[in-house]
Amino acid sequence: MYFDKIKLEKLLQGALNKYNIPGLAACVMHEGKIIYKSGFGLRNVSSNSCVNSKTIFGVASITKLVTALIIKQAENENILSTSDLVSAHVPDLSCLQKTKIEIRHLLNHSAGFPGLPTRHKSTDLFNSRINDEMKSFDDLVVYLNKLDFDMLAEPGKLLSYSNEGYCLLGCIIERLYSKSFISVVTEKVFEPLKLSRSFIGMNQAEFFNNIAEPLEVGKKNTNFVPIQYWDAPLFYSAGGLMTTVEDMSLLISHIGSIGTFGASEPLTANKIPVTSRNCMRYSYGSGLEIDLLDNNNTLIWHTGQRPGVSSFVGYLKELRLSVALSINIADAPTARLGRNIFKEFLQNRIEPVKLQWPPKVDNNHFKNDDLSKFTGIYGSLEMGNFNVFE
């Protein structure tokens, strides 16, 4: 597949400068083969060591597609069904006993969970706090049983992004296989796909080199300061993946091209609309977002964000093209940059506006006299309250 390498590298280098990014790795695959890979900037500020395509980064929520894949593999092995009630697999979670939440609802974030304060109470192996309550999936069950909260909607009715839902999927996986989540991922994903520079959590970091340190902008806004990885075992199934852009590209290529990789159905099945965006071409499947473009093209993708980490992985099935990005600072615009890379390869095949990110807002979507009904106080146990006014 033809592309202008000089133009692509100008795009990536420009992003480094524009968004004050310390280090960035990128990889593009076509038909499962690498056609572009590179690194820009620093992976370690104290040693001035540079990023390359084999540098390992935390990729946060991109972990979710791995967790979803294992659940679908388990369904193919006939040891669960995604239509099973979650309460059948986690009977000790009392808040689920009167609900009809199924595994498929956890996969596409439609279980109805509100924002919960779980991450503020979870054990960080690098930064233990006195009020830490949760290290394991079983600890999560105990915590949720004590927490007073109301569900947002009936299962399947509303997308409400929930890390806790993916923690519960991790709990189900460990109970199904009677093994740690780390062991199951290694046996069912890393080893079969030969993802040789991927692992879960930081406990295996000592066996690898070339790991990017997470950074944040210093007080003077001119320098970068190292921070610790957030290493919370409870969230391993929601965001614990450490990997390279090469391994990420290979993973999404297998999922996208084969469609299942030993799973019962593609991860794009069981989708629900993302109603926070202003048209119906955006949806969420099982650990993947799904964008309907034009000419019957479909982009499957996900991002990851947490302190010191920004990532993107995407796959365009019709062109068998994958893009992976990793950055060692939070809040980098990886979704926008990932789409801009796709544009360089697609040329005139897809209307550029279809790959725009964030999506273009339709100013006529709401009449001015409708806006008042959205004012008021909003909030959650996870993020606190905020006021919306005209």
Question: Model-predicted segments: where are they?
Answer:
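Short, conserved catalytic-motif segment at the N-terminal edge
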Residues: Y2-V59, I79-S81, V142-L152, V225
